[in-house]
Amino acid sequence: MAEEQQNSSYSIGGNILPTPEEAATFQPQVVAEGGWDKCWEDGVTPWDQGRATPLILHLLDSSALPLGRTLVPGCGGGHDVVAMASPERFVVGLDISDKALNKANETYGSSPKAEYFSFVKEDVFTWRPNELFDLIFDYVFFCAIEPEMRPAWGKSMHELLKPDGELITLMYPMTDHEGGAPYKVALSSYEDVLVPVGFKAVSVEENPDSIPTRKGKEKLARWKKIN
């Protein structure tokens, strides 16, 4: 395993996770050449830890995640979807990439939890399901979209949540690098697009479970839909 330094790549189970600054130097070219499918086809997935996000596991262990219908936009390989799924929490993993969803289904299609989650190919900006969600979890989706699309993201989060629903954002990467994806974010990046549509931040804190290359570069924010 790579030495745990904040400014160098880090390996988890064979997955090399670069810093966001490093990822922003090569990932955009692959996306430009063939979209997100090309990233998955070529194995250029620096956002994918190959396992559930440690923070999600921590929240589950401490019973700090709401129950009910849950959405993970940009679910990728589906690790967080399956981790959160339970008889009391049905989870929908959404992605526009066939390759990502194929991988998710190959990995988790025979999971004993299979009846408690589903993977759906849809665009979160246009998809309107028959039933709204109690919880949405966004980690590396917000930072992957073009910054000018962020107001539309905020509107979609509002439209997809039930009244009094909760949005959990693991805000990353909180850096000052140029370019993307991943694009740099700040708390204000979220406030600017969530507060005007009816969200209130109920807590903002450092992520105690960051992997080494992301330590000090991400924060956990929990938002309530108040109107």
Swiss-Prot record:
Organism: Arabidopsis thaliana
Pfam families (UniProt xref): TPMT
Free-text function comment from the UniProt entry: S-adenosyl-L-methionine-dependent methyltransferase. Involved in glucosinolate metabolism and defense against phytopathogens.
Residues that span the membrane, as ranges: none
Chemical reaction(s) catalysed: a thiol + S-adenosyl-L-methionine = a methyl thioether + S-adenosyl-L-homocysteine + H(+)
Entry keyword annotation includes GTP-binding: no
EC numbers, comma separated: 2.1.1.9
Binding site for S-adenosyl-L-methionine: 36, 40, 47, 74, 95, 123-124, 139
Family to which this protein belongs: Belongs to the class I-like SAM-binding methyltransferase superfamily. TPMT family.
The protein's name: Probable thiol methyltransferase 1
